[in-house]
Amino acid sequence: ALSALPLPSAERRTLQALQDWTQREGQRLQPLLTARQAAGQVRECHGDLHLGNLVQLADGPQLFDAIEFSEALRFIDPIADVAFLCMDLQARGRPDLGWHFLNGWLEHSGDYAGLALLQWYLVYRALVRAMVAGLRWGQSGQSGQDASAEAEAAWQEVQRYLTLADLLRQPRPRGLWLAQGVSGSGKTYATTPLVAARAMVRLRADVERKRLFGLAPTANSAAQLSESIYTPEATERTYAQLLALARTVLQAGYGVLV
């Protein structure tokens, strides 16, 4: 739909580069997409999870206007919904909230393998928003001296999302950071600002230790499993899991803080 609009030459070149990139990446990622679908990762999601479909109420954020008319657009890999919200937060000038949301979702789901698809979905979702804005722009008149305020706003949105999509497809700097301290020393508190400042994924030993024993991240592990979760053997398993997950994050193209 975007390519059918009378875009200026600069935006048309950007769009062509993005279309070429998404096609190449889609082909490269196809085996992973197929494998995740076979493993049951595709499920009923929101399908249109941008900030225009989210409201902050007194008891927390509430989603609305999920896609109901098309199962093909609603039954998707959850990382596609996660990417949509992260992308839109960045488009609205709050990438920090996007990184905190992503890390919270990863801790809850444990789906670090899905990070291999994140960049592709980020770009795809930015192009979706550019397309929606482009349709509004095309319907209200093109940019120019006589353009309406609505057309100008739509055109600026097209530019914003195209620019963001082009930025999101670029390789990211990767690195491995380690935080060390005894239990209860404040590692989580101290490293939380770094998650957004450095735009990275954080792996928490206590969360992954609990996951190995079938506990939720917020579960009281001492009360449920006594000392068994903190034996030397359990610690070795936890460290091995952290190493494997750190490798997964780095291979997906993201920095990681352990």
Task: Describe these PLM feature segments.
Residues 192-254:
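Conserved substrate/cofactor phosphate-moiety recognition/catalytic segment
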Residues 177-179:
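Hydrophobic anchor at the beta1->P-loop junction of P-loop NTPases
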Residues 182-183:
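P-loop (Walker A) phosphate-binding loop of NTP-binding proteins
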Residues 1-51, 55-175:
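ATP-dependent phospho-/nucleotidyl transfer catalytic cores
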Residues 187:
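Conserved lysine of the Walker
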Residues 256-258:
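Short catalytic-loop micro-motif centered on adjacent basic/acidic residues
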